């Protein structure tokens, strides 16, 4: 028979969970620390299968005598169990001795769950992600007193133990709450992973004068909507045109071409101002480069607007039919000149003959998908903890710098907050490392990733605005 051991410090709710899983009051529960001194055992059912549940005494690392014996028995029970539920009090902050014991137990038993109890609502659950620093593969939030998350815990246990539920299940009244909770959890996960489809994707077309922006717009639309001329600077006002790509409405803004500062006069100053205002509202920028000519410093400065407005980006290599170099050579120069756009995909096109225009349309949708990507909180925290385990944060003059947990508080672009003990000590190079680590795990091609650091209990201004708080 499979064995499940509940272990943890006194008064974290072990006996209450034992009673909840056993569906009867067997273990005595009390607010007095250390009420449970003997190991309690009870055969229970999980997914229609019998398992042995073991309620250990509360562990105090420094206790001797009676409580030292309790600790010894509890640790032995944990080593012998098939699954260990290490419980902590979610109302308290993570304790170093808990972390040390948890990691020691993990060396003895690979099926070790970290169960954070007393998480009574979603706000407390967000704070509960501080416990991600334990490095647990299975991190579960429950409230035994509110019967919150207990059903999900049972399903995780069944999954690890390979317990298969009977094909026909008749739900009792008690089980209906678990089922409802499970369905709600599925809905919440769906909400985290899938953002509501945008009413329209706003795409700004930017580049120097006469690189073919208006020709590109006409090629995308399939008709001549924007005036095309060999005279540099024909487009003065941004031109808005919309179309549908695979059922998704896309609004294109053909912006005015940008000249070197010394040559900007009168009405073109107005045009530059209008262009920047258009980009403020854009989601994605198509940075158009003329491949029939050498790239210039001005191309780099225009590319800087993408970084300034944190836009999704595609580098469009136009006039590819009359290019003077091969792709590898062009790609090498683009990556060298536009280091801040290393995440941008490159698409070769010819606005004149329609080459790769359909490919560009598909890439616009893909980049927007990445630009609006939301990582489920549990997966995000596991990824951040893996990153910090592989490459620990540098200390700050001998003081430990630690990431407690992470939350993604915004999309378009993805915005992630790292909750830390010393946020001011997060070096830009480590921030870049975290961004690159996320790019290795998830598809963020064409999208910037914004990383912020803050203390516990604080919210940054953009985080407050994203959450709609006062």
UniProtKB/Swiss-Prot annotation:
One Gene Ontology biological process: ribosome biogenesis
Domain EngA-type G span(s) in chain numbering: 2-165, 201-372
Positions of GTP 1 binding: 8-15, 55-59, 117-120
Alphabetized Gene3D superfamilies for the sequence: 3.30.300.20, P-loop containing nucleotide triphosphate hydrolases
Domain KH-like: 373-457
Key words of the record: GTP-binding, Nucleotide-binding, Repeat, Ribosome biogenesis
Binding site residues for GTP 2: 207-214, 254-258, 318-321
GO MF entry, a single one: GTP binding
Assembly information from the UniProt record: Associates with the 50S ribosomal subunit.
Function recorded in the entry: GTPase that plays an essential role in the late steps of ribosome biogenesis.
Family: Belongs to the TRAFAC class TrmE-Era-EngA-EngB-Septin-like GTPase superfamily. EngA (Der) GTPase family.
Matching PANTHER family: GTPASE DER (PTHR43834:SF6)
HAMAP family reported in the protein's UniProt record: GTPase_Der
Protein name per the record: GTPase Der
Source organism of this protein record: Wolinella succinogenes (strain ATCC 29543 / DSM 1740 / CCUG 13145 / JCM 31913 / LMG 7466 / NCTC 11488 / FDC 602W)
Lineage, broadest ranks: Bacteria, Pseudomonadati, Campylobacterota, Epsilonproteobacteria, Campylobacterales
